[in-house]
């Protein structure tokens, strides 16, 4: 069997500290057969250093991908151009093709992020925050991922069909 992929892994043990070249958490992840992890919102840019160290063989661990830090409301967007600039900075400086907005602001702000990511060929994901209305509007606006459950059970056919037709993961 090829390695497992953890598509929502917050590698907490390697955040906000001096880089460790012998991290037990990364080794344990491999020991359980997980060879690739994706962190949809690392709390620091340390993940970029770990990506490089793993790729260079300096640290033993699974292939590591991340959105880097999430886009928060302090990124005051005033226009679609501001959103393009923000997405471009993430894409170029964090070397990522995935970005996560974490309740960046109004729905208009989220729509600008969705439009900018489409234009710049970056995949947008969003913090669902267990809020049904927020989650559904993010799906309708074009986000490819909703990182947490809707928080409502059961989901009725209209929501299930919306998710299936949109291709949005949750």
Where are these regions (language model features)?
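Divalent-metal coordination cores built from histidine and acidic residues
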Residues: 3-12, 21-126, 130, 135, ...
């Amino acid at each position: 069997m090829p390695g497992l992929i953890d598509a929502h892994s917050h590698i907490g043990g390697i955040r906000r500290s001096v880089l460790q070249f012998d991290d037990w958490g990364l080794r344990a992840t491999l020991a359980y057969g997980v060879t690739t992890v994706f962190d949809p919102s690392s709390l620091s840019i340390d993940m970029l250093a770990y990506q490089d160290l793993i790729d260079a063989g300096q640290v033993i661990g699974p292939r590591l991908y991340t959105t880097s830090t999430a886009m928060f409301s302090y990124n005051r967007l005033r226009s679609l151009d501001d959103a393009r600039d923000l997405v471009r900075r993430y894409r170029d400086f964090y070397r990522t093709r995935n970005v996560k907005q974490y309740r960046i602001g109004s729905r208009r702000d989220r729509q600008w992020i969705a439009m900018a990511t489409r234009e710049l060929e970056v995949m947008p994901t969003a913090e669902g925050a267990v809020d049904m209305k927020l989650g559904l509007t993010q799906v309708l606006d074009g986000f490819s991922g909703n990182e947490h459950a809707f928080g409502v059970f059961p989901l009725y056919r209209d929501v299930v069909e919306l998710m299936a037709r949109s291709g949005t993961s949750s």
